[in-house]
Amino acid sequence: KKNLFLMTGSFALSIILFLSFSVMIDFVDYLIPQSAATSDIDIASDDGNAIPRELLTSIRAMDGVREVYGRRSAFDVPARLNSDTGFSGTTDMISYDDFDLQCLKKDSALKRGSDLSKVFGDSNFVLATSDQDSTWKIGDTVQIGDETLTIAGLLKNDPFSENGSTNGKLTLITSDETFVRLTGEEGYSLVLIQTTGDVTDENVQAIQNSVDQTYSFRDK
């Protein structure tokens, strides 16, 4: 009877610990909210900015879709940071559309003093990722080819790295229009989709069927 009592007590304690742990996980998830730009479906190209604009237009009109936004990318672009004569290397450039840029403000992702409004449209202003060791600052200029870009704002971290650190790499975020002007590339490397609350499996399948099989499709 004593052993049975101990076994029963141990089993009950295990259940209590499991439930407590589950509640703790939910609580942690609550404390760490998702970004306003978090996607439910990702479509990616392994061949650069190859996804056509028309695909976004097509998906935007489909059932179960709440928001569609795309990003373009250019890596290891020769650049010079004018405020730092010791920096003469390369930068990565990522384009954000208006929705993506607005999400940075919603998420309070920008450092104090940043002026997001300057980045919209075809401009000479960009955002830059940063961390505590970054040497660049708001107001610095970046020379890319014949273009001079001014850093209008800094992100509090680097959302493109696993640990949020820049690791000394300067990454610029531009508007759609600015990216196209600088690179001449209009296609996307990544398309992100937010679905509606009542999206069905059939809706998701229809979206996938509209995507060229040469692109990767990830339903989260």
Q: Predicted regions span which residues?
A:
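Membrane-proximal juxtamembrane linkers immediately C-terminal to transmembrane helices
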Residues: 28-46, 86-87, 184-187
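Short beta-strand boundary microenvironments
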Residues: 39, 53-62, 66-140, 147-163, ...
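Small-residue transmembrane helix packing/gating motifs
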Residues: 157-198
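Alpha-helical transmembrane segments
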Residues: 5-7, 13-40
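Short, surface-exposed ligand-recognition loops at beta-strand->loop->(often short) alpha-helix junctions
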Residues: 44-51, 195-199
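A cross-kingdom feature of multi-pass membrane systems that activates on extracytoplasmic/periplasmic
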Residues: 195-220
